């Protein structure tokens, strides 16, 4: 069991976690832990060519998982309706820290922000 995971990272340097410490054999320990077994591609989805490349990749995947604020994927031409028109059996999971609707839905959220809001 398992999945072939392609992680899309922002150019030019990819995931900022790659440069975090501590280092293990010159690689960031947290990056190794969180991305073990994943393939990574740097694609700028803010460009037409980047969005086009993502739409081409959809033909080769079963699931798209995204964690942008609600509406970002639609605004980039990469929403569920667009991707499902390309590959009708695509599964898409949209994960956001404050949900898809509500007063805080448009706010970005990461682990430390969620911990602060919940009192951890």
Regions found by a protein language model. Give the residues of each.
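N-terminal helix-loop segment corresponding to the beta1-alpha1 unit
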Residues: 1-120
